[in-house]
């Protein structure tokens, strides 16, 4: 099923499943634009060769959540499948999974518990869909940190130290501020940042970087690959198109204004040498203008802008 509103939820689904989908549509600032629903038999188990994963690989979506009774083994299967999709096929899929130490920017390890809603208590698995919908309904300029869940009456409350410890472990937890329940710091499960920076731990930043990657990739596929001669001037035309896109992101305060996009001279130099073309006496401009067959080498630098989260206020008398 492809749903764009709660009015489209199939009446043939069980009451619990209908309620689960409604929670997804609760969103945050906005509801999710679209919710994909795959219905499995009660006895089905999510495995590496499951039809649901084959189907998902043909769909376009941002966040995935399993059934409310997903097991640890099934969550592990989804993690492995999703990371393979990202590494092998440039997918931008991400997942919200319960109590899963994944150490990946693409997996949100939701660790909420004792989630009380209208007399019913949910565990982390039962509320992953709600969290996935909340993230999907959060504008790119915002993070989910301290996003409220107004329907939640109470949770298993954590101390400040326990919350900090959970965040350090890459867990997304819920926080009760004494009046309402809201999300803790909007982090994914990444804890090992070798070769990366700490910004990859933030749900907001990864969502932005995935969007940029996909937008640029689709623009190149739809408007450039196979459609233009691979001349220097046409390479600059592509550079200009990407730069205009990045300028729009900077105008929306999604990235800093010091972005850059241009021909990757080092990569182009290395390719020319691999083809047997000596470059030692070539100027940088000559390397840029050299014939590179079907290949285009670009380098892009962006500096993502995070949301306001850590505020220190000193009051003096």
Where are these regions (language model features)?
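Residues in well-ordered beta-strands of folded domains
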Residues: 38, 65, 301-303
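Structured, hydrophobic secondary-structure cores that serve as assembly/anchoring elements
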Residues: 1-19, 28-30, 135, 167, ...
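A broadly used, surface-exposed interaction patch
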Residues: 15-52
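A glycine- and small-residue-enriched flexible loop/hinge signal that marks low-structured segments
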Residues: 47-222, 254-269
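A short linear-motif detector with a strong N-terminal bias
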Residues: 13-18, 41-45, 71-73, 124, ...
């Amino acid at each position: 099923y492809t749903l764009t509103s709660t009015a489209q939820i199939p009446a043939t689904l069980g009451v619990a499943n209908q309620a689960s989908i409604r929670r997804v549509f609760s969103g945050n600032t906005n509801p999710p634009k679209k919710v994909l629903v795959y219905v499995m038999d009660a006895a089905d188990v999510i495995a590496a060769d499951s039809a649901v994963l084959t189907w998902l690989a043909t769909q376009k979506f941002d966040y995935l959540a399993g059934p409310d009774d997903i097991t640890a083994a099934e969550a592990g299967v989804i993690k492995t499948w999703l990371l393979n999709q990202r590494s092998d096929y440039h997918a931008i899929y991400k997942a919200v999974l319960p109590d899963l130490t994944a150490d990946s920017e693409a997996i949100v390890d939701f660790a909420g518990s004792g989630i009380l809603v209208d007399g019913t208590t949910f565990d982390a698995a039962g509320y992953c869909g709600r969290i996935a919908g909340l993230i999907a309904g959060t504008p790119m300029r915002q993070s989910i940190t301290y996003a409220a869940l107004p329907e939640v009456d109470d949770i298993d409350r954590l101390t400040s130290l326990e919350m900090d410890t959970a965040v350090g472990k890459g867990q997304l937890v819920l926080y009760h501020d004494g009046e309402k329940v809201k999300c803790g710091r909007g982090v994914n499960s990444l804890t090992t940042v070798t070769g990366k920076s700490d910004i990859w731990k933030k749900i907001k930043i990864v969502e932005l970087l995935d969007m940029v990657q996909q937008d640029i990739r689709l623009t190149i596929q739809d408007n450039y690959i196979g459609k233009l001669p691979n001349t220097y001037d046409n390479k600059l035309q592509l550079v200009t198109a990407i730069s205009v896109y990045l300028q729009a992101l900077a105008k929306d305060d999604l990235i800093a204004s010091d972005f850059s996009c241009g021909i990757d001279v080092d990569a182009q130099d290395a390719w020319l040498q691999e083809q047997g073309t000596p470059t030692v006496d070539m100027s940088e401009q000559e390397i840029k203008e050299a014939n590179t067959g079907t290949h285009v080498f670009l380098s892009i630098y962006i500096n993502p802008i995070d949301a306001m989260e850590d505020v220190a206020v000193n009051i003096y008398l």
